[in-house]
Amino acid sequence: MSLKTAPVIVWFRKDLRLSDNLALLAAVEHGGPVIPVYIREKSAGPLGGAQEWWLHHSLAALSSSLEKAGGRLVLASGDAERILRDLISETGADTVVWNRRYDPTGMATDKALKQKLRDDGLTVRSFSGQLLHEPSRLQTKSGGPYRVYTPFWRALEGSDEPHAPADPPKSLTAPKVWPKSEKLSNWKLLPTKPDWAKDFSDIWTPGETGALDKLDDFIDGALKGYEEGRDFPAKPATSLLSPHLAAGEISPAAVWHATKGLSRHIASNDISRFRKEIVWREFCYHLLFHFPELGEKNWNDSFDAFSWRDDEKSFKAWTRGMTGYPIVDAGMRQLWQHGTMHNRVRMIVASFLIKHLLIDWRKGEKWFRDTLVDADPASNAANWQWVAGSGADASPFFRIFNPILQGEKFDGDGDYVRRFVPELEKLERKYIHKPFEAPKDALKKAGVELGKTYPLPIVDHGKARERALAAYAAVKKTT
């Protein structure tokens, strides 16, 4: 084969889209046949159950989009190097392209593989597609990484505008013979019995089309009033883009540019607030890039001396949404029912696990990793450490959310609680976030029997707060 006609392998990873996919566009511009491949890597470890559900549907959507453009998606599982070498041998490809990833395992794999393939005379090119800017690009005046969000935001805001999103290729050149592909159904990514994901499709449509639809809906609706509305879980006031960004079904650059030119009918503070959330995701990846053990070790190592409790009974009650605190239970049940949780409530339930129950943040991070459709190695780790007080630019440990007051402030009418904790549906408004304070007649009228139809609190807020502060004080003494 001549250089001009040799196939190019496009290795899809966290970029399951055709639009604004710089690796795919480079393959098309190469001029030869394009062979898209997705590898279920052995070295990457297992995905969480919710992410597996998402991946199945996202790969199906990507496969359909590629077929419409004249291509197809080759699926393979195992060792990435072996699979790519087999594909190169089978197809005669002389070039491999991919979009960069920034988790520690992925970066190590890519670095080693790129060098090995280049040593064999192959062309290997990587592109930016997961973030607005490379995490190594922004540096403090002293040349180091940022550790505080606000200066990071200012630096990014003052840097070059993210690239304008590229259109998808109109067509793909197919090879004369397609390499063998595994069947997606054989990967068994979907739950069977029980089908705990049966309600996911009520709110989620994985894939690039679903991502673009979510973005359009948000721009036309919830972006207006976002700054205030985003904190109220009963309102449809958030973008719901996080799982699409996590899977790479839409690029952050596309989201960023979609908010341009809207100031005539949407307040600038709403646009700025939303962009800051996009940049917070960037900040999380900046931290993970410079501190690869973010998901395993405390950023602030003084927390290594913290005396966590081994309380499996309380942890189980938390995971099941049976703590006796309605706002916490509503969040945990939303997580199980829809694979997501409102951001404000994520902070509340994380604070409750860490500070009310004194359970290690890493247990919570692992649970979220298994149950969130938008589980992300950078955001998940950084946000849990932020709540714990052990992370970069973290909320101080002594900031302990009162789950009753948080519920009353952000779910005043109890609509969120009533939706996900239906056993409290008929309880009157003033008791919806503290059923344990309701008089017997109010409970009876609502059909609530504490300890039977709904649990009593597994911990007293006041006592838990005192215990948490004492544990924190003990750490301060030893550091």
UniProtKB/Swiss-Prot annotation:
It comes from the Bacteria. The record marks 308, 361, 384 as: Electron transfer via tryptophanyl radical. DNA binds at residues 230, 406. GO terms for molecular function: deoxyribodipyrimidine photo-lyase activity; DNA binding; FAD binding. The keyword DNA damage applies. Keywords: Chromophore, DNA damage, DNA repair, DNA-binding, FAD, Flavoprotein, Lyase. Photolyase involved in the repair of UV radiation-induced DNA damage. By using blue-light energy, catalyzes the photoreactivation of cyclobutane pyrimidine dimers (CPDs), which are formed between adjacent bases on the same DNA strand upon exposure to ultraviolet radiation. Can repair CPD lesions in ssDNA as well as in dsDNA. This is Deoxyribodipyrimidine photo-lyase. It comes from Agrobacterium fabrum (strain C58 / ATCC 33970) (Agrobacterium tumefaciens (strain C58)). The gene is phrA.
